[in-house]
Amino acid sequence: MKLRYMIIGAGGVGGPVGAYLSKSGADTTLIERGKHLAVLQEHGLTLVSGENERESIPVKAIDMDGFLAAREQGAPAPDVIFVCVKGYSLADTVPFIRKAAGRDTVVIPVLNIYGTGRALQAELPELLVTDGCIYISANRIAPGVIQKHGAICRIVYGLPSHKIDHPVLQQVETDLKNAGIDPVYSPYVERDTLLKFAYVSPNAACGQYYHAKAAEMQHPGEVRDSFVRLIKEVVALADKMGIPLESRPGELVERNLRILDALAPTASTSMQRDMEAGKQSEVDGLIYQVVRLAEQYGVDVPEYRKIAEAVKKQTENK
């Protein structure tokens, strides 16, 4: 089965995914805009990793209007759409997806925010929308150029039905493997996306509170201790939500510390970078949402409350 892929957003998440799929020979179209799009079209996407190792990969890229114009002229719909935008931009993709998709198009959101798949499915009831997330540390450093921090690139996706027999999603698993991406077609995707959130949310919260990059969190001390406390609070919240994340106490802390310690020392979260630049960020979904859920489920999250209050003051003072 030969699938046509669309990647909405070619930044630190969608850029590498689109580049790897394109390099493997998969029919892949990246949706972007502005200067980033112009460079992608002229020079391809450049991935920078390690000690300034650079690889430029030819990609097919277009903006939303251009793709819809092509659809009106008879261009085929994508079989699979990976949604790789920031959480605050998710709603903006819905009208485009409605027009770009075909009847059998499958939508796979891989955002940082927990519950994205359910939210998108409610907006697109006519399409099949999975839950999903991605493990990657990368960011755009210039138009057409993505800096990777570490080798990990894992996409987790699946359906609330717990079934893993959908032929398109099975083919996605094969195509991702062929592209050098680690796929997890999960029968327990709600748990697995919350597992990802239990890493990225503490990482973003701790990093923003202490203005710390990975290096400060990779060594014993207050910053690393805070990261651990945040993980434990998400675990407690998940237990109250009926989605246990651990088979034994401390398991998730150990797992997340291994992920953290494998990052380049210069790595930081996209939320931190956006907040430092005064841009719109995912702070609501990554920090404040945990406090709201804790109130809803009656869970004490003192570390999150402390950080949420401090971050609100930081933003109010800017």
Language-model features: where?
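NAD(P)-dependent Rossmann-like dehydrogenase/reductase catalytic/cofactor-binding core
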Residues: 2, 178, 228-318
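Active-site-proximal catalytic alpha-helix in oxidoreductases
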Residues: 190-218, 222-235, 260-261
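Rossmann-fold dinucleotide-binding core
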Residues: 76, 112-196, 202
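Rossmann-like NAD(P)(H) cofactor-binding subdomain of soluble oxidoreductases
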Residues: 57-145
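N-terminal glycine-rich dinucleotide-binding loop that anchors FAD/FMN and/or NAD(P) in oxidoreductases
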Residues: 45-64, 200
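NAD(P)+-binding Rossmann beta1-loop-alpha1 motif at the extreme N-terminus of oxidoreductases
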Residues: 1-54
